[in-house]
C-alpha cells in the first residue's frame, strides 16, 4: 500500500513529498527530484547556516533533497540515505573522526589528475598574488558513507511516529566480524520477484572535465527480504577507476541487517592490459561503473558487518 507524506528539509525548510511503501513491519520512504537550484546551493555554502557542508566546493549537479528511509517502528529503528550526509564524508576531518570511532572502515586515498605534476612544479616564490591553499575535502567527491541509522526519535521521520519519544528501545550494536554470515546471493536472483524498487541519486560532477564522480543508491524490496547497493563512483580520465560500494541485506524476521563494504580501484593502464576498452560508448553509458567493475577483479578492501535491530 502506497501513501504520500510530506516533510520539511534544510537548507530552507523546503516541503517535499515522500512516497511510502509498507511491507512486513517495515515502512520505506523515498523522494527523488531534480537537482538543487542555485539559491538552495548558495544556502548550503552560507556562513552560520545549520546545514552548511563546509566542503571546498559543491558538485555541479546535487540532488540535496533526495532521501531514502528504512523504518521499523517496533524496533525504533531508522536507516537513512541522505546526499548531505554522503557529501559531508568528503571532508577529511569528518572522515578521520568517524574512522577513529569505527563508524566507517575505509578512507579513500586522494587521487590526482593526469597532469598534476605540471601544476605542482610551478614556482610561486616571490609571487604575492599566488598562494597555495590546503584542501579540506576530497576534490573527487569520493565518499566512504555507509548510510546513517538511529532511533526514529532522532531521525527526520520522527513526526510520523509521535508515540516514540526516546531511545529506550533502540540500542546501537554492530558486529564487525560476521563469522561467515554473508549476503545470500540466491535471494537476489530474478526468480525472487521485486515488489518495489527505488533509485535515489545523490550527485553528479565532471571533475572540471577530468572525468566523472557520482553517488546513488539502488534499492529493491522482495517478498522475503530487501537489498540495496549504494555506490560512490569516481573516474579520473587516464588515471583510475574507483567503486566504493555498500551493500545492505535484510531477511524479514532476522535480528540484524547484513552489510558488505567493498572498494575496487584500478588504474587505466592495468584495465587496458586486461583488455578493457575505454570506448566512447562506454564513456557515455549511465551504467559505466557496472561495466568496468567486471574487469576490476577482487576488492582492494572488503569487510562484512551486522547491524543488530
Give names to the regions the model predicted.
Residues 3, 27, 32, 61, ...:
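Intrinsically disordered, low-complexity segments enriched in small/polar residues
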Residues 206-207, 284-309:
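WW-domain-binding short linear motifs
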Residues 45-157, 207-217, 221-284:
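Acidic, low-complexity, intrinsically disordered interaction modules
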Residues 2-54, 58-59, 160-229:
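Negatively charged, low-complexity tracts enriched in Asp/Glu with abundant Ser/Thr
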Amino acid at each position: 500500500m502506497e501513501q504520500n507524506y510530506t516533510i520539511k528539509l534544510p537548507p530552507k525548510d523546503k516541503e517535499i513529498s515522500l512516497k511510502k511503501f509498507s511491507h512486513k513491519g517495515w515502512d520505506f520512504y523515498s523522494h527523488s527530484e531534480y537537482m538543487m537550484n542555485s539559491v538552495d546551493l548558495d544556502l548550503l555554502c552560507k556562513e552560520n547556516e545549520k546545514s552548511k557542508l563546509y566542503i571546498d566546493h559543491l558538485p555541479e549537479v546535487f540532488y540535496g533533497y533526495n532521501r531514502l528511509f528504512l523504518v521499523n517502528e517496533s524496533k525504533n529503528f531508522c536507516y537513512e540515505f541522505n546526499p548531505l550526509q554522503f557529501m559531508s564524508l568528503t571532508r577529511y576531518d569528518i572522515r578521520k573522526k568517524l574512522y577513529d570511532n569505527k563508524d566507517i572502515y575505509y578512507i579513500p586515498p586522494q587521487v590526482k589528475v593526469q597532469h598534476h605534476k605540471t601544476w605542482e612544479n610551478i614556482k610561486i616564490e616571490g609571487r604575492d598574488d599566488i598562494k597555495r591553499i590546503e584542501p579540506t575535502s576530497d576534490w573527487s567527491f569520493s565518499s566512504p558513507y555507509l548510510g546513517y541509522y538511529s532511533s526514529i526519535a532522532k531521525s527526520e521521520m520522527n513526526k510520523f511516529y509521535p508515540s516514540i519519544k526516546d531511545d529506550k528501545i533502540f540500542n546501537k550494536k554492530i558486529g564487525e566480524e560476521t563469522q561467515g554470515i554473508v549476503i545470500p546471493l540466491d535471494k537476489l536472483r530474478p526468480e525472487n520477484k521485486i515488489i518495489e524498487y527505488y533509485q535515489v541519486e545523490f550527485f553528479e560532477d565532471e571533475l572540471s572535465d577530468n572525468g566523472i564522480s557520482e553517488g546513488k543508491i539502488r534499492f529493491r524490496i522482495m517478498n522475503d527480504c530487501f537489498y540495496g547497493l549504494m555506490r560512490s563512483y569516481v573516474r579520473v580520465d587516464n588515471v583510475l577507476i574507483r567503486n566504493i560500494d555498500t551493500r545492505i541485506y535484510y531477511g524479514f524476521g532476522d535480528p540484524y541487517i547484513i552489510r558488505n563494504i567493498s572498494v575496487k580501484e584500478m588504474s587505466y593502464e592495468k584495465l587496458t592490459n586486461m583488455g578493457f576498452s575505454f570506448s566512447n560508448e562506454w564513456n557515455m553509458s549511465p551504467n559505466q561503473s557496472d561495466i568496468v567493475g567486471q574487469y576490476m577483479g577482487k576488492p582492494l578492501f572488503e569487510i562484512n558487518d551486522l547491524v543488530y535491530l
